[in-house]
Structures are given as C-alpha cells and as structure tokens.
From Swiss-Prot:
Top-level taxon of origin: Viruses
Region feature Disordered, mapped onto this chain: 1-22
Described purpose of this protein according to its UniProt entry: Encapsidates the negative strand viral RNA, protecting it from nucleases. The encapsidated genomic RNA is termed the ribonucleoprotein (RNP) and serves as template for transcription and replication. The RNP needs to be localized in the host nucleus to start an infectious cycle, but is too large to diffuse through the nuclear pore complex. NP comprises at least 2 nuclear localization signals that are responsible for the active RNP import into the nucleus through cellular importin alpha/beta pathway.
Motif Bipartite nuclear localization signal mapped to chain: 198-216
Gene name of this polypeptide: NP
Primary location: virion
Protein's recorded name: Nucleoprotein
Family per similarity comment: Belongs to the influenza viruses nucleoprotein family.
UniProt subcellular location: Virion; Host nucleus
Keywords: Capsid protein, Helical capsid protein, Host nucleus, Host-virus interaction, Ribonucleoprotein, RNA-binding, Viral nucleoprotein, Viral penetration into host nucleus, Virion, Virus entry into host cell
Biased composition (Basic and acidic residues): 8-22
Originating organism: Influenza A virus (strain A/New Jersey/8/1976 H1N1)
Length: 498
C-alpha cells in the first residue's frame, strides 16, 4: 500500500511500541512471547501439572482464558456491581484435565484473579503486558475462525452467509486494541458498525449526551479503521460518507453492506499473524530458549520453527479423526481459516480438506461431555515450507470458487490467482444505485467488473524451505486451479455461540 510509510508494523501495534527498527521490534515481540511462556510454566507449577498435562491444548486454553478474565476490567467491574448467584466476581477458573490411572479426568479449578494477575505480572517483569494479553485473544479468535461458522451473525446484520471470508476476528473483544483491529476482516468491522447504527435507530438517546459523544467518537474511529482497510479511492470515499453522516441510519447500513460485498472482489487489507497456544511458548522457554535475546516475529519463519519441534497433545472424542483435529489447530495457529486451501495444503505439505469434510468438532470440551471416554493424541503442527504472512488482500482478480464461500482472504504472501465467483458476487449488485453514494457505487461496480482472472496476486512471491531462514530462494508453487479452494464449502460446522 502506498501509505505504508505512515503505518506502524503490526509488531509495533502488538507491543504498543513507537517506531522501532527491525531488531528492536523482534526483541520486543520476543519479550512479549517470553512473558507468556514464563507465565504458563508458573501456572503449570501452581496447578501441579505433569509435563504431559502441560502440553495438553485444552489445559493451555483454560489457563489462557483465566488470565484474560483476570484482566478484563470492565467485566470484573460489572460482576462486582451486579452480583449473580453462585458466581464469585473475584475468582476465575475452568476445567483442567489430568491423567489419573490411565484415564483422563476433569477437575474444575477456581483461582483468585488477584493471584493470577500477580503471576502474570511477575512473568512480565512486573508490567501489565497488555500486548501479551491481546496476543492470546488473537490466538483464541483465530481458533474460533477456523472452528465455527458465523452464518447467524451475518444474517442478523443483513449480510450474506457466503461472505464468511470477510469475518476474520469476529469474536475478538472490542478491548483488543490496535493489534486486534488490524486482524479484523472488513465484514467484522462492518458488522460492528451496523450493530451500532441499529442501536441508534432503536434508542433515541444512543447518540445523545455525554455517553452519546463517546459513542460517536467510537463510531468515527471504527469508520476510519474500516476505511484504512480499503485499497481503492471509491471505497474510501464511501467510508467518509458513512463516517460524516449526521444521523446514521438505514442508508448507512445499506452502504456498509454494499462495501462489505465489494470487498469480496476488491479485497481489503487484513493483517495475519501466527499466534500459538501459550503451552508452545512455555515449552520453548522451559527448554532454555531466550525469546528476547533471539528476537521473534509473528509473520516470518519463527512460528513455523517453533511448531516444528513442539509436541502438543489434544483430547480426542471417540469418533473424531486426530489428523483432522491437527488440521484445525494448524489453520488456527497460522490464522489461515479464510486462505485458499491449495495454498495452505502446499505449505503444510499435507492435503487440507474443507470444513464440511472434517471429522472433528472444536478443541474445547463442554462440561457435560464424558472425558473418561476420551483419548489424547499428538497434534501434527509441522509444515513442509514456510511463507510470509500478508497484511494486504492481494490485488484482485477472479476465478472459479465454490458455492458456499465465494471468496478468500489470503494469509500467506504467495503468488496465485485469488478465486471468487464473479457471477455470484455481481448478482448482489443489481439495481440499488441511487442516493448520495451513487457515483462511488458505479465506480466500485465498474472496478469489480473489470477485475481480470489472469492477474496474479503477490507476483513472484513464494514459499520457502524451512532451512531458508532469510527467505532468499522463493519457490513459486503452481496450483491445480480446478480443485476446490474454499474451506467453508459445503459447510456443516457448528455455529459460534458466545
């Protein structure tokens, strides 16, 4: 993007830092990762987890959720002001799985939030280390993106369920800061804005008074974030209109849905970063790896190297396929839920199958499931190649895509055509060209119609051997473009229920 010079890299957002050079960025990201790892080791000690139990991804998720809950100030304040029966606002906890007499057992633990905050700060040189907390949130968000479909949420805001490739980060909390905003898809932010506008339509006081002023500031800020994701002048001009509207209403909702649809072909810039479960960082720290000294990047080879030699386990339900569970977690680790399966499969060195053909449910286990009937197996999280994660949507062009998910949002910076079904997308743009944004709409539709199938995205960018740490010899893969490329094709995934 042309305005690259004015932007902070996401590592800088991630660490809350001002402008730093590459070495400083690598060191501060490394410090953040090391802090998560030290915290995890300490929690395993407190919970008396064996080495094997500490590598169980379900235990990792429980520990991660506890620290997020301990630092969720707004919710903590709310819980203290609205006490609910049987819930101690000062405590947090969850299921911890232990191996007892050859069987897995679930143990519900409860901890003082204050105690968890103490352990976290101690692991992070006495600081609150909010960057590390955001990093954990993004890992959970990536896991949700790979696991669930958001059909209901899309339909509720008047968007089309086939627009799921725009929904990255849809379960990220608002408090996830700049790093969180960077990884949100165009559809996610459009949906948040539509939700605000709808509240304003239903509630006369939403935009009024002191609270309303704050709401307005949040609205305009969100509009600017969405504007910054678009790469064409017409899309940005339309966002200015939405932002400047005196009294946002149905016209703005229409504009936002139009813009979200247009992003299926004129893709927005959405950041991708590999965020791994805390237990992976813990394992590395325990084996003597000094993240701050070595430096770390979320968008380079480092996460791939880390996964090459980490052994992580998962509980497997009786009828689940462990290889499929591995694919799900691999996609989550690399934020690849909306990537073209052919690209992911090439990098991973294993066939990657669409969501609808996976014999696995989510990673987390509900409290009413019988754990004793479950086995654990090793997650295969290694890869054949590595590739740089992208923060752009790639340039846009067309090619056959599937009936359910009609576009992709690239994760890896690898040369290919980007599939979308032009006929399907364009069908959504019939008529409706009136109103204040008509000239911009006409321009956007013209650009979409002239997007060419043969244009390659990320020209000359390729994947790299794992031995090629400096990314010197790109291998540009060739893909069989007749194969299915969308993950959510023929989908039967569970809905995300908060």
């Amino acid at each position: 993007m042309a305005s690259q010079g004015t932007k902070r890299s996401y590592e800088q957002m991630e660490t809350g830092g001002e402008r730093q050079d590459a070495t400083e960025i690598r060191a501060s990201v490394g410090r953040m990762i090391g802090g998560i790892g030290r915290f995890y080791i300490q929690m395993c000690t407190e919970l008396k987890l064996s080495d094997y139990e500490g590598r169980l991804i379900q235990n990792s998720i429980t520990i991660e959720r506890m620290v997020l809950s301990a630092f969720d100030e707004r919710r903590n304040k709310y819980l203290e002001e609205h006490p609910s029966a049987g819930k101690d606002p000062k405590k947090t906890g969850g299921p911890i799985y232990k191996r007892i007499d050859g069987k897995w057992m679930r143990e519900l633990i409860l901890y003082d939030k204050e105690e968890i905050r103490r352990v976290w700060r101690q692991a992070n040189n006495g600081e609150d280390a909010t960057a590390g907390l955001t990093h954990i949130m993004i890992w959970h968000s990536n896991l949700n993106d790979a696991t669930y479909q958001r059909t209901r949420a899309l339909v509720r805001t008047g968007m089309d369920p086939r627009m799921c490739s725009l929904m990255q980060g849809s379960t990220l909390p608002r408090r996830s800061g700049a790093a969180g905003a960077a990884v949100k898809g165009v559809g996610t932010i459009a949906m948040e804005l539509i939700g605000m506008i709808k509240r304003g339509i239903n509630d006369r006081n939403f935009w009024r008074g002191e609270n309303g002023r704050r709401t307005r500031i949040a609205y305009e800020r969100m509009c600017n974030i969405l504007k910054g994701k678009f790469q064409t002048a017409a899309q940005r001009a339309m966002m200015d209109q939405v932002r400047e509207s005196r009294n946002p209403g149905n016209a703005e909702i229409e504009d936002l849905i139009f813009l979200a649809r247009s992003a299926l072909i004129l893709r927005g810039s959405v950041a991708h970063k590999s965020c791994l479960p805390a237990c992976v960082y813990g394992l590395a720290v325990a084996s003597g790896h000094d993240f701050e000294r070595e430096g770390y990047s979320l968008v380079g080879i480092d996460p791939f190297k880390l996964l090459q030699n980490s052994q992580v386990f998962s509980l497997i339900r009786p009828n689940e396929n462990p290889a499929h569970k591995s694919q799900l977690v691999w996609m989550a680790c690399h934020s690849a839920a909306f990537e073209d399966l052919r690209v992911s499969g090439f990098i991973r060195g294993k066939k990657v199958v669409p969501r609808g053909r996976l014999s696995t449910r989510g990673v987390q286990i509900a409290s009413n499931e019988n754990v004793e009937a479950m086995d654990s197996s090793t997650l295969e999280l290694r890869s054949r190649y590595w590739a740089i994660r992208t923060r752009s949507g790639g340039n846009t062009n067309q090619q056959k895509a599937s009936a359910d998910q009609i576009s992709v949002q690239p994760t890896f910076s690898v040369q290919r055509n980007l599939p979308f079904e032009r006929a399907t997308v364009m069908a959504a743009f019939i008529g409706d060209n009136e109103g204040r944004t008509s000239d911009m709409r006409t321009e956007i539709i013209r650009m979409m119609e002239s997007a060419k199938p043969e244009d390659l995205s990320f020209q000359g960018r390729g994947v790299f051997e794992l031995s090629d740490e400096k990314a010197t010899n790109p291998i540009v893969p060739s893909f069989d473009m007749n194969n299915e490329g969308s993950y959510f094709f023929g989908d039967n995934a569970e809905e995300y229920d908060n």
